[in-house]
Amino acid sequence: MSLYKIEQHFFENVTQHQKEAMLKDFEVNNDGDILIPYTHKGYMVNNANIEFREDIKAISMFSGAGGLDIGTQLAGIKVISSLDIFEDSVETLKRNKFFSHTIHEVGDITEITGKHYDELLKKEKPKKLIIVGGPPCQPFSKAGYWVTNEKRDSNKDPRNMILPYFKIISELQPDGFVLENVESILHPSNREAVNTIYENMEALGYHYSLLKVNAADYGIPQKRKRVFFLASKKEINATLQKTHGNEKECLANPNLLPYERVID
């Protein structure tokens, strides 16, 4: 257990109500500083000892800083290749020893084909292959609408990479894939984009589940809502059981843990 100190002069920037609430909940030292106890909780994965499955391997698209890749590997599936259009993102991944075995590439998904991965797949010889990717969210994000306050056609947005993603999927024919995006992709204004996803999954012979997830419900100290389209060549009925909840939910369900807070 450690103590985080908020010095007295901080209160010059808060309301009296906020100050009273903090003084009520936390200890105060002789100098008038608030002391907040907290436990170090590691969200680092660099030293995680993962036993990877031999039969399934993954290729990552739109890899960014590796969020989906981390989740994939924590689930025991080695990411053998990652791709992102931004060099800074790829350099970040290269410096993360959690992906020391992964081939990280700078590239534009619209300019590559499934043949790009022929040599890698011959070398790795996975019995089953999955692809994970979160196409750029800007065409579907609420934030973009708030900035411009204009109606947009997400299917005409050049940043919409749903079809290029499905082109790679159609060429590689993975046993399954993940398509992640922001919750607002399900807004009626983006119905055409969602229909494109469903139509392509069905045309390629995939069964699928749709999961709507709030990261706070699973022990992450932030409210981040995301949508996951999970597709498989076999029947799939994916569900998630939340592990955390607010005070009212925890009282109703003793199996739930209270939401994590950054201050904790």
Residue ranges and their predicted role:
Residues 118-128, 140-264:
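Class I S-adenosyl-L-methionine
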Residues 1-80, 200-203, 226-264:
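S-adenosyl-L-methionine-dependent DNA methyltransferase catalytic core
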Residues 21-173, 183-187, 192-195:
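Core alpha/beta nucleotide-donor-binding catalytic domains of modification enzymes
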